[in-house]
């Protein structure tokens, strides 16, 4: 009898433990189903379980030491954080609705703090709507479709910095609307049309408003087809094009009633002026 009771108690205990394990497993399944998905590649990617939200996080840092030797003077060294960028991008609700945010923290990016002036931490803050592979519509602050060297990220340059021509003549960033039509094919003639209507005041402008706007239009031609891995967006031929690839582009920019010496950049003008820019680019990779 005692053996029978002991056996029954053992069976009941095993069943109870099994039930506990089953419940615990079910609870874990529920918890796991609520966790986001992680991906790696261009930074750290986080996607919600229902795939309605995606966030990619990455940063970029460039530290620089410079040696200076002028004739008749003692040698000198300088060290600086040339660039420090933090970038967020992804989509909300649907992969057709995207966003991008880029912040900068290096002294050369932020600039000197002055009374009544904004701190230039925000570089990009824009939302995109891409209904298909050809059309893109943008609203917010980001780069204008200007010269190629400026459009390319500073992390995709051939050398450590852009040219002095870019520093003087670029149209840089602005706040407004942009619309792109992209028609790229791998092995045949391709072209892109990019347009923008913006404030013309440059990034992070909060001073007095006016009725002047900036208009930008750009045409890109690729006679031998599109570049591998979006090769127009980085200077070196790291993708190793097996056939010649050529990019010819021209942009026209008119900044009506500009307030600054370089349109979107520079110091304040004594009188508002309308500025016009023509930007031509060519890129060959083979």
Task: Report each predicted region and the residues it spans.
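Bacterial Sec-dependent N-terminal signal peptides
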Residues: 1-22
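Intrinsic disorder/low-complexity detector
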Residues: 8, 22, 65, 194, ...
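N-terminal periplasmic/intermembrane-space "pro-region" immediately following the signal or transit peptide
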Residues: 17-60
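Intrinsically disordered, low-complexity segments enriched in polar/charged residues with Gly/Pro
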Residues: 31-33, 75, 114, 269-270
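A short catalytic or substrate-binding loop motif that flags glycine-/basic-rich loops and adjacent residues
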Residues: 38, 170-171, 273-274
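Outer membrane beta-barrel
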Residues: 42-203, 208-225
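Surface-exposed beta-loop-beta
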Residues: 204-286
């Amino acid at each position: 009898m005692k053996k029978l009771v002991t056996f029954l108690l053992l069976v009941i205990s095993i069943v109870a433990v099994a039930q506990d394990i089953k419940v615990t497993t079910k609870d874990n399944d529920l918890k796991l189903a609520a966790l986001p998905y992680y991906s790696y590649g261009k930074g750290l990617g986080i996607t919600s379980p229902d795939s309605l939200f995606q966030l990619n996080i990455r940063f970029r840092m460039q530290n620089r030491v410079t040696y200076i030797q002028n004739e008749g003077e003692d040698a000198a060294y300088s060290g600086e954080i040339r660039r420090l960028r933090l970038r967020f991008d992804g989509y909300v609700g649907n992969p057709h609705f995207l966003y991008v945010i880029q912040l900068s923290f290096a002294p050369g990016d932020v600039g000197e703090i002055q009374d009544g002036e904004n701190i230039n931490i925000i570089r990009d803050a824009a939302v995109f709507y891409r209904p298909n592979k050809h059309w893109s519509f943008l609203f917010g602050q980001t780069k204008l479709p200007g010269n190629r060297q400026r459009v390319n990220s500073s992390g995709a340059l051939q050398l450590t910095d852009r040219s002095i021509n870019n520093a003087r003549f670029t149209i840089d960033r602005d706040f407004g609307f942009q619309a792109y039509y992209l028609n790229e094919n791998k092995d045949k003639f391709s072209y892109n049309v990019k347009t923008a209507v913006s404030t013309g005041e440059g990034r992070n402008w909060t001073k007095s408003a006016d009725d002047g706007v900036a208009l930008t239009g750009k045409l890109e031609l690729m006679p031998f087809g599109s570049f591998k891995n979006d090769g127009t967006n980085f200077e070196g031929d790291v993708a190793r094009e097996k056939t010649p690839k050529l990019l010819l582009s021209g942009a026209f920019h008119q900044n009506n009633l500009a307030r600054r010496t370089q349109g979107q950049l520079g110091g304040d003008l004594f009188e508002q002026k309308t500025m016009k820019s023509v930007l031509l680019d060519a890129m060959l990779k083979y």
